[in-house]
Amino acid sequence: MVNTMTWHDVLAEEKEKPYFRNTLARVAAERAAGKTVYPPQTDVFNAFRLTELGGVKVVILGQDPYHGPNQAHGLAFSVLPGVPVPPSLVNMYKELVTDIPGFERPNHGFLESWARQGVMLLNTVLTVEAGQAHSHVKFGWETFTDNVIAAINQHREGVVFLLWGAHAQKKGSIIDRKRHHVLHAPHPSPLSAHRGFFGSAHFSQANRWLTEHGESAIDWMPQLPAR
């Protein structure tokens, strides 16, 4: 049987739950009070818009969005074109240079082309106050993203989960290892990348798994949108 569950179905189900209504209300109240919240309201659910549930091939978990101006746009680790590449993504590019033959470090951090190929770039908290890292951690987003991971676990087969750092690894503890391929490494941040993120070869391992299971490999070279 073909599973036709979509993110629209999952989100509609969550929106009926009191915790999620409360989460959305708290974020709306922050914006209404004049606080700057990232990403902009229209971008909060971009990961779901760009990577449909039925097309998820790889999941990369982040934590909360970048909290500087013009950075966050709803995809974990990604920044808008024209913004300096953040340190963790610089380290991801360094790893890609050594892991993927022919990869050349791009001069931008815009990862939408990954998302369109089936790489779910999911932050575990989807909003943040400007300049205040982890400021929305208690808003209920973690419950929502637990349920998102559970939906991928249940409705997809053979997804590669790249879990970097203790937070992502704890978050991914519910994943069925018999149905999905789970890879662990330290976080790519400058604080921990040298403890085993560099040399982990997760990007090539993900592609090998996908091709061995009848899926197309990911082109990890991020593309800017055509002008």
UniProtKB/Swiss-Prot annotation:
GO terms for molecular function: uracil DNA N-glycosylase activity. One of its GO terms (cellular component) is cytoplasm. Pfam families: UDG (PF03167). GO terms for biological process: base-excision repair, AP site formation via deaminated base removal. It comes from the Bacteria. Keywords: Cytoplasm, DNA damage, DNA repair, Hydrolase. Its EC number is 3.2.2.27. It is found in: Cytoplasm. SMART domains: UDG (SM00986), UreE_C (SM00987). The active site is at 64 (proton acceptor). It catalyses: Hydrolyzes single-stranded DNA or mismatched double-stranded DNA and polynucleotides, releasing free uracil. Its main location: cytoplasm. Belongs to the uracil-DNA glycosylase (UDG) superfamily. UNG family. PANTHER family: URACIL-DNA GLYCOSYLASE. Excises uracil residues from the DNA which can arise as a result of misincorporation of dUMP residues by DNA polymerase or due to deamination of cytosine. This is Uracil-DNA glycosylase. It comes from Erwinia tasmaniensis (strain DSM 17950 / CFBP 7177 / CIP 109463 / NCPPB 4357 / Et1/99). The lineage of its organism: Bacteria, Pseudomonadati, Pseudomonadota, Gammaproteobacteria, Enterobacterales.
